[in-house]
Every structure is written in structure tokens, then in C-alpha cells.
Amino acid sequence: MREHRVLLLCLLTAAALAGCTSEQPAQGDTSTPTLSTYSPPTYATAPASTPPITTGPNVRPGEKPPTFPASLNRNDRVAADVYAKYWMQTLDWGYATTDSTLARQAFLPLCTDCERFVKGNFDGARAKGEHFRGGRVSFVSSSIQPNDHRRDSTAVSDVTVSVAALETLDRGGRVIAHAAAIPKITYRIWVRWAGARWFVVDWKEAITQ
């Protein structure tokens, strides 16, 4: 992954997401994943927080915050793959509302790249009275990957999304930054089953082959 500090100009184009870590992109792997008997150590889960904001200047009419289906709150590969997609939806909601609440509920504190991203983009924008126009994330596809147990992950998925063109507006409504649309980009997302639910423990831009 390309090395950047998370600045507001980073925002959520694919380049923004790619710029939220300092390590190399995950290499694509087309091998068939196998079930693992690996048992990671037990860690404290993320604390509960307040409900997410449901309105904002970048929220579409009638749109509600994304939710992870209760029926998929189980420890299996299919549920993990859906949760990886849900992580991207929480980031999309952050760009709709400049609220990091939903995203913060989705990852464990050890995901420092997650923390850096939501703090530098959503929290930073909100503190300055800024908001976004466009930049919304659309799901394209996902695929289960072999688990390398990175940060004691339970499962790994690659999620491909597209990102609309984005503008950042100051509190007076003036455009102060913009970024082009990204038709397609893939992220590798490591998730862990902990405390009877899923959490993100790391994410990187994936180099597909």
C-alpha cells in the first residue's frame, strides 16, 4: 500500500482508502480457501457506543444506516464475507454523515489503520464543520481468501467496490477539495470472531492478479 498520512484531502476515493496504511498491498491469491482449526488468543472486544447519526447533507432520500443481519451473526466463512462487505458500508455511511460511530463499532482497537482512517477523515471533517458531496461507495463483489491469521484473524475476504467522485465542502458550502471517481478497487479485509460477533482487525488495498 502506498504510504500516506491520513489527511482530509485523502477522503474516500479509492486512493484515500489505499492511503490509510503504511504497509505493502496484500497480494491476491486465487487458491481455494480451506477451513482452519486455528484458535486465536482471546482479546477484549470494542466497547459499545451511541447510535449512529441518521441524517446529513450527503444522505440520500429515505436512506438508513447499514446494518449487519442478525441471522448472519455466526462464526462461519459466509458470515465473515458479508461482514467484510458491511465494513465498507460503514465507511460509506461515514461519508454520508461525517459520523464515525458506525465504523468504530465495526473494528477492534488493534486495527490502527481503521482508527487512523475514521479519525482523519470523518472525525476531522466533523470537527471543522466540513461535509462531503458524492464519494459514495458501491459494492461490486467479494471473495473469500485463505486465512493467514494476520492479527489473529478468523477469516479474510477481498471486497471490490466503486467510488463516486467526491467533493469536500466547508461550513459555508464552498468546495475546498475534490477527487475523481474510482470505477473499481479491491480491499483485503481481515475479520475476527470475538465476543460472539465479528470485528475488523485489519484492511489493505489488494493487488489482484
Please state what every model-predicted region is.
Residues 1-3, 208-209:
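Short, intrinsically disordered, low-complexity terminal/loop segments
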Residues 3-4, 8-10, 14-16, 20-82:
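Juxtamembrane and targeting peptides
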Residues 8-9, 86, 181-182:
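Short hydrophobic/aromatic segments of transmembrane alpha-helices and their interfaces
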Residues 24-33, 146-209:
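Exposed beta-sheet edge and beta->alpha loop/turn motif
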Residues 57-132:
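Core segments of small alpha/beta cavity-forming domains
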Residues 90-97, 140-157:
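N-terminal short leaders/motifs
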Residues 126-146:
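A short, amphipathic edge element
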